[in-house]
């Protein structure tokens, strides 16, 4: 809540008519819950790949700033975050953590065509295993990678049969375990 609080306060001081939209992960929407109830709310659990925003309760000071300066809060799913991550990596050759791409993931929901929009992308606090996992999950969700298991009889040539079937489907084998 601290990042949007500061940005919203500064932006509204410069231009009071600017629209400020906050974005939270669906699995950790503590600010949205607080705004809807007009009081701090402690979520029973949080579950999101955006670990930097995975808080059960927003802080009191950010909550006050959000009530005063933020016009709307939307949520995005972990799937939408993975899609945004993959877009950022493939099209722009950039890496940002899940919490840092919430605004990018929300752009499709906000109907921003032909509008001046600032989407803040921040934070590169990710280890290589998380990066690899996010890329693989994104490719799987887009149908670009398929993972499957098959039990083959212990007869010579069976792997060749599977390889031939994959070739007929114009598929590529990335790895065999």
Positions of the model-derived regions?
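Short secondary-structure transition/capping segments
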Residues: 18, 71-72, 166-171
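Active-site-adjacent helical/loop segments in soluble small-molecule enzymes
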Residues: 59-115, 174
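Short amphipathic alpha-helix segments
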Residues: 155-176
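Glycine-rich phosphate/pyrophosphate-binding loop at beta-loop-alpha junctions
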Residues: 2-68, 108-114, 118-153, 163
